[in-house]
Amino acid sequence: MTADDYTAVRCGMNVTKAIIQGDIDAGIGLENVQMVELEEWLAAQGRPRDDVQMLRIDQLAELGCCCFCSILYIANDQFLAANPEKVHKFMRAVKRATDYVLAEPEKAYAEYVDFKPIMGTPVNRKIFERSYAYFSRDLKNVRRDWEKVTNYSKRLGILDAFFTPNYTNEYISWALDADSTDPTGDQKRMAELQKKVAANGGFQRLEVAVSA
């Protein structure tokens, strides 16, 4: 397929709406967000939820990692240099919140909805459940994932050949988990796990084998 075989349509994060309205035939989205929205829309129309399908970019590109749904905390060099303690405190706060979500997902979701009632819908509940497995326990940037995505972007011509990933784990003050010994296998197992969550609901995590 070349760029002459399709028409790109800019729709921002409104992929679900654009597909439902027929503005686009396919779009780029997240398995734990747009897929859920489309599945529930189909169910409301009396149609099977599996009428919507997703081709995972990480699987298509054989990246061996799922890194397109990462939340990044971005700061410029000047702020980092002038406020290292603030950054440390911010990361500790994020870690504390992450630990709480992983330990008490039901309570965490209830507090989330209490703070932002508009999110208290059946669809958003399912999105939260489908997002649970993706939470990073230690919040670290994984070098392998950054390198794979960077190289993939270079092959696509998005990045030039001299680009280097710009990230750091310097402001993480706790022990980091060891890297997975089978990231490609994890990718496949995560897909199967998410199918179970989609069918049965609840909060499930993937058990990952790590290097010693």
Where in the sequence are the language-model features?
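Short, surface-exposed acidic
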Residues: 2-7, 48-54, 116-130, 159-167
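Conserved C-terminal helix/tail region of periplasmic/extracytoplasmic solute-binding proteins
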Residues: 151-212
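Pocket-lining segment of extracytoplasmic ligand-binding domains
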Residues: 12-117
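Bulky hydrophobic/aromatic packing residues
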Residues: 2-4, 32, 38, 108-109, ...
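Short secondary-structure boundary/hinge segments and terminal tails
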Residues: 37, 60, 130-132, 169-176
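Secondary-structure end/capping motifs
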Residues: 81-161
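Hydrophobic transmembrane alpha-helix bundles
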Residues: 43-57, 137-164, 202-209
